[in-house]
Curated annotation (Swiss-Prot):
Specifically methylates the pseudouridine at position 1915 (m3Psi1915) in 23S rRNA. The lineage of its organism: Bacteria, Thermotogati, Thermotogota, Thermotogae, Thermotogales. Its EC number is 2.1.1.177. This is Ribosomal RNA large subunit methyltransferase H. The gene is rlmH. InterPro entries: Alpha/beta_knot_MTases, RlmH-like, tRNA_m1G_MTases_N. It comes from Thermosipho africanus (strain TCF52B). S-adenosyl-L-methionine binds at I71, G101, L120, S121, K122, M123, T124, F125. Homodimer. It is found in: Cytoplasm.
Length: 152
């Protein structure tokens, strides 16, 4: 299975070890790639809408015409079992594409183009933490799918 995650910005050095840990663990289950796009600009110099529009354009340029799942605070909430069933069903298509919004959120047009919106929590996380949480939940999903213990 191919899994791609598109996220604006860069990963902070303090999260790099956790990111690398889950990338390594997930290699056993899927071909995973993470694409970091440019941030849309400086909020001190430009409006939020201009920045979100730029980020949306960058993301859609990477998405092309593919179906994608948006990680969105207002999306569908699932527990880990439901998410693992979702991933298992998507394995039939051979590809999963996730998009995470940037620090200022998500442009409405990007939200409308998503084939599905999933929320990881009712809480708000930074885009970097969202990436790490998504990686952890993907790893957990594959462990559930393969009927393997998660802890130790």
């Amino acid at each position: 299975m191919n899994i791609e995650i598109i996220v604006p910005g860069k990963l902070s050095s303090h999260l790099q070890n956790v990111f690398d840990f889950y990338l390594k663990k997930l290699k056993r289950f899927a071909n995973l790639s993470v694409t970091f796009t440019k941030l849309g600009g400086d909020v001190n110099r430009e409006s939020k809408q201009v920045i979100l529009r730029r980020e949306k354009d960058e993301i859609l340029n990477k998405v092309k015409n593919r179906r994608f799942i948006l990680i969105d605070l207002h999306g569908k909430q699932m527990d880990s079992i439901s998410f693992s069933k979702f991933v298992e069903n998507e394995m039939l298509s051979g590809e999963l594409l996730f998009v995470i919004g940037g620090p200022l959120g998500i442009d409405d047009e990007l939200r409308k183009k998503a084939s599905l919106k999933i929320s990881l929590s009712k809480m708000t996380f930074t885009h970097e933490f969202t990436l790490v949480i998504l990686l952890e939940q993907l790893f957990r999903a594959f462990k559930i799918i393969n009927n393997e213990k998660y802890h130790y």
